[in-house]
Amino acid sequence: LKSSIKSDLILGILSDRIMSTKIMQKGRNNKNDQVEYLETPIKSEYDKKEYRAIRLPNGLEALLISDEDSKTCSSQHQDMKNEMKAACCLCVRTGTFKEPPGFSGISCFFEYLLMTEFEKHCLKYDIVKLTYKHGGSFKYLFDYDEYTLSFVIDIQEKHFLSVLIHFAEFFTNPFPEKEAFMQNRSNIKGEFQTALTLAKNRVPQPQLSSFTRTDHPINQIIEDRIIKEYENLDYTKLYEELHKFKKRHYSARRIKLVIQARLPLNTLEQYVTIDTCFVNIPTNKLSPDDSTKLIKNNVPFDSAAFHKMYKISSSKHVGQLKIAWVMPPLYALYKSKPYKYISWLIGNEEKGSLMSYLRKKMWNVSVSNEEICYNVHTTAYSLLKIDIDFSIEGKRHVKEVLDTIFSYINMLKQKGPQKNIYDDFSKTAENSFRYSEEKDPRDNVSNLCIHLYQYPSRDYLTGSKIYFEYDPKTITNILNYLTPETANIMIFDKNFDYLELDKVNSWSRVSYTDSEISQEWLEHWKSIEPLPDFHLPKNVNPYLGVQYFLEPLPAKVPKYPVKLYNDSISELWYRPDPKFRLPISHIYTHFISSVGLQSPENAALMTVYCNIIKLLVVEELYSVVAGGHSYDISVSEKGIITKISGSMPIVLLLNIIKYMIYPNVKKEMFETIRDQQVDIYSDIITEPEKLAEDVRLWIQKLVHYTYVDMHNALRNVSFEEFQNFAKCFTNRLYIQHLIQGNITQDAAIESMQQCFEALKCDSLHSSMMQPNRVFQIPLGTSYYKLKNINKCDPTSIVIDTYQIDITSIELSVLMKLIIMIMEKQLSLKFQSIQNDLIQHTSCNYTDVDGILTYSISVIQSLPNKSYTTELIKEWIDRFLEYFKDFLDELSENDLDDVKERLRIFKQHADMNIEEEINRNWNEIIKCQYIFDRYEREILALNNIKLNELREWFDKYTWNENYVKKLSIHVIGSDSAEAQSIALEYIIDEHQHKNIEENYIIKVEEYQKKLFVYPVTEG
């Protein structure tokens, strides 16, 4: 560092430790008397943070968040995990789509300049290096709906002010000098193209945006004339226009700021108001809102193109129906949120709902956490959207599905607004807000910064969450927007006739066709009566009236989960929550069975079984979830995992178990879900990255069924075979429980007993438990080459994997350090590539059932017959040679920086109880039970020396007596060959040239010669 920069950093650190330094006093005396204090945001009773909203003299509005209480909690309850990062988000709303004549797209270029100049500024003041060393990061975020660009930075608290000063300094004058700009004019055209691409990628609802009026600003960005305007560009004129644009649209009155740290509010205010910080951002007296008025007469989508039906090619087998209605911006209605009331009713999944009927007819059999009906709000317009996945049966009944949707909407119109339903919905939102878990500071500040544009200061926290007032008139008004003739209808499917799709979308480049919606259909949808199956939610949700209370803590709370019970059928781990103290408990359960590992048919049936359970419980548990509970059901290698949270999680668990034992499903429903899962497997194996990773695990593991195996096996599985599978699954089980949170030890034991009594299962015989085992890759290099299953995809990928040894704390920490160093160098090497040989690189280390490996992946996705996977492999080898030299030149100080970043990560305080639970759960399901793993890793980290890294890398990457390398090649193709779902092995000339290397032709034959590592699970 230069001496002046070093002085700034030292000054910053001292200022952070001593709250009354001269620089702070000066800023306080000069600026504080002009700071305007806004109304304090309303917060939840369980939120221990303190908030202050202020407006600086230049008009910039800031939200200050003091999290001092978490420092006390961390020191009391988690001695080791007490690191916390401070975070800052500055959000800029420039004049997006307010281009002057002759300079279309200049707003995009201006935002791009802000980003590139910020990067230069960070490099100049070593902010990148400083944030990296001290566990921090910086990134950009585009808000698609608010047309804003956010700059987010976080770092260890003791270094926060030193970085914040330099961070703020950039925004006082972010524009490059004319001389520097003109020197770079040879790159301007390319940079403008990059800026335009970024802007197109982040325009909200790109498919819909191409349907706006041709004279609407949103539509202008897709015009070819933008590029033409810049072909013979006068760069002096461009600079002048950019300068004018900055003067008009870059103003402190259009900038918002949020900072969060474990420091007093007064200190945070000093940080923001000192002379060197945000008070010097330029301002003007022009309205901060006029450049965001992108609509005329509130009708941006009035073109005939919007009100049509579109058939669009999809890359996925699962079809989808999307319906959208456009409305004027609805932010002003945030207190009553009528749009959310309507979207909640349309997306309701209880009996009598739209989704219940579609599932009954088997037109939809998907269950996910994604909303079925949702709202999109921008400064230009609002949308109400319905997204429904089609089953194979649903694709055959598109018209009937549309009839059903409009029938349900007509019922909502006939019934009108219902205050009791609104009140239930409001209580649900209040509970969710009251008991919401903490977010990471970086995520929190970036989310809240957008709220500063949308709500008055008192509602910064509550504006998007709480329902303040019931307004039946606005509900009726929005329902009246939902008419057939104003709807935009899109149908996505992979199996459309490509000859029928005669157009290409200018945004996404996908094929589509459009058609007018027949007048007969429109009239039918207007008058269709509600189906007799439909009714509104009938009763008040009983789970909303549950009284929440905190259980008393025992005199001594264990630092980690303790085992309360263990026998041949189950084990129970338990820990109360002394830190977060929310009236919520969590039950995680792993139902382990041997049946899923017995064949590819059973492995696939495990997923089908899980999907059927999710479908069966969704209606019954919907009201419980609305009452504040959450649940997740997923498949593991050994069985099924449930994760349940709420005030009474055992209620949900017992319901799930009921359907596990008796999955009362008809043959037609099973076949529909089975066929959909076959399609999902088909989509997965046509993605070359997933195919390569799947094959890599297949070769390494003693038992692993590939997606190809499961795809081919599942197609022929009968309903009777499924019934036998379901019965066998619950006959013999081993069950792992972890219970944490607001629950007593006795209640935890009782919950486990209720679970066992409901299942009435026998224990797994030891001979039936197949522990995960791994093959030892032979010395040298083993190659496996296969064709990309998607014959129209030119993407090729190479994954080179180096198998190391049985896992240990010391070895895993050393490898993590290596990968952290390698990631950065791999990224730099990738950026320096001058050709299009490679489009993506990554490196990783993996614990494959107790055996550690590290790997490098490289993707080539452009059609070029001269580029082979052998060239990619050679590039990887050259990189590893370079990396060896880099390690040899690495200094101890450089290593200390990486170690410090890893230490901060390991010691970062948990933001919510789920972070702790997930860490403990990972130990339990792996049967390792090292709950103090992070503490042990810190001890190991402190003892690792630079020479150990060098020796380790040389030994396992270059020493022929230790190198065990597996090289997977997936070869892309641009041919139009007929496709079949099978692994197609490739024999090429390299196998004959390198006879000393091991080319795998038949995996089973190759594995017969290999040693199998011993069991590594606890």
Regions found by a protein language model. Name each.
Residues 49-51, 57, 83-87, 146-148, ...:
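Extracytoplasmic
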